[in-house]
């Protein structure tokens, strides 16, 4: 029969736990430890070490006892010996050799320090992966600007061209990578509907200007008309009988080359029945050419500084207007189109009007889009055989060659003009693309570029002409990598999106800090003044009277 053995119970009235140590455990050495402690690590003599702070205490014990089992690399002093310290003359080869030896010694010392402080050791394959990871990280930082140079200025957030209100609703959003993939080939040959205005002939003496024979830029007081689409009387007349999309060449060029833009801009779209009108806002900076917009470090001066972005744009506008008239044979014979300038009143002096001609052209984009555009010519030129060529005249201006990785035009323009135009293509890519699109839309045979610089870098009121250059628009488009098929594809995409909208007023806005354009729906009365409303009411009353 099984017998129950009563266990021995130890009573400890003054504490808890056993009163005495059992005989089998008496005098046995013991040190607190944790089962999670690592007893040591395998020494890898072929691997490379690198510091990883996450594993600094990987092999250390929580109780302080496991460290006696860890591996520490100690220097071997068995090979220590005295050497002769007498200084001898060293050759250049020996000096370089000692330099490399000292570098290797420092590397070995760093490796020993890493081993001592429990730093991770990588095998050769992991070493290559780590190098690849660091290389890709540096490439990413360089590409996206995460890591800035010590002397690089931080980019300030740019302001929007118009304040977005809370009651505006986003209807569509298009990012630039998506637009850059657009292509459209079904574009018909343009058809001239109406030609207006008069042009002066280009003075070929300006082609012989060099940096040694610079010519002062004169201030010429002439009137330039920048009339938007819906205020154009010719477009209003044409809209009654033909076309369903109407715009100006400047507005279309902005859309067609929008993927190069950096600053914010906006275009008003009005959907009236089945027709679309692309307009610009009144009193906006839409017609001001930007300066160094696409440079790595665009101008960021603020306030009244003459190098602020807006003041530079005003200076560029002044230069463009004056150069486009000074390089013509003013006051002499003009080339007249069949119809007069639609924006000139009868009592105005013809010599006070800038040399400009308007060509209203029509394109068929597929079967459903009938596009009518007002295009411009700035002058006319005669060839060797007396043939007439229409030209667009634009100006590149140098404001400070020390900024935006520029080159000094007075030193490089005659001998290295390619370097100058390459720098301008980098710093003003969007502006040059817009000018090229305008010349292509107008059908101009040549695009004339004038090089104008400040008389002194600190004086933004006086300028000198350093030279001129002309391009054929198609060849120049290829030179600046402007795809005409992509430009028409972007325009067709924007038109299709706007055609799907309901009747009303909308705004196409380029985000000031992102590569995105958005389409906003605008409430009634937005961007409309009281005078515009009164004019619309008067026009409606006149139409009603004519009908009765």
Swiss-Prot record:
Region Disordered: start-end pairs: 288-309, 523-548
Give the keywords, sorted.
Acetylation, Cytoplasm, Initiation factor, Phosphoprotein, Protein biosynthesis, RNA-binding
Q: Which InterPro entries match?
A: eIF3d
Query: Could you cite one Gene Ontology molecular function of this protein?
Result: mRNA cap binding
Which residues does the annotated region (RNA gate) include? Answer: 285-299
Q: What Pfam families is this protein classified in? A: eIF-3_zeta
- N6-acetyllysine: which positions carry it? 53
Location of this chain's protein in the cell: Cytoplasm
List all Acidic residues biased stretches: 529-548
Gene Ontology annotations of biological process type: cap-dependent translational initiation; formation of cytoplasmic translation initiation complex; translational initiation
**Which GO cellular component terms, listed alphabetically, does the Swiss-Prot or TrEMBL entry include?**
eukaryotic 43S preinitiation complex; eukaryotic 48S preinitiation complex; eukaryotic translation initiation factor 3 complex
Domain comment from the record reads as follows: The RNA gate region regulates mRNA cap recognition to prevent promiscuous mRNA-binding before assembly of eif3d into the full eukaryotic translation initiation factor 3 (eIF-3) complex.
**Which family is this protein grouped under?**
Belongs to the eIF-3 subunit D family.
- Give the function comment from the record: mRNA cap-binding component of the eukaryotic translation initiation factor 3 (eIF-3) complex, a complex required for several steps in the initiation of protein synthesis of a specialized repertoire of mRNAs. The eIF-3 complex associates with the 40S ribosome and facilitates the recruitment of eIF-1, eIF-1A, eIF-2:GTP:methionyl-tRNAi and eIF-5 to form the 43S pre-initiation complex (43S PIC). The eIF-3 complex stimulates mRNA recruitment to the 43S PIC and scanning of the mRNA for AUG recognition.
Q: How does it assemble?
A: Component of the eukaryotic translation initiation factor 3 (eIF-3) complex, which is composed of 13 subunits: EIF3A, EIF3B, EIF3C, EIF3D, EIF3E, EIF3F, EIF3G, EIF3H, EIF3I, EIF3J, EIF3K, EIF3L and EIF3M. The eIF-3 complex appears to include 3 stable modules: module A is composed of EIF3A, EIF3B, EIF3G and EIF3I; module B is composed of EIF3F, EIF3H, and EIF3M; and module C is composed of EIF3C, EIF3D, EIF3E, EIF3K and EIF3L. EIF3C of module C binds EIF3B of module A and EIF3H of module B, thereby linking the three modules. EIF3J is a labile subunit that binds to the eIF-3 complex via EIF3B.
Q: What is this protein called?
A: Eukaryotic translation initiation factor 3 subunit D
Q: Which organism is it from?
A: Pongo abelii (Sumatran orangutan)
Coding gene?
EIF3D
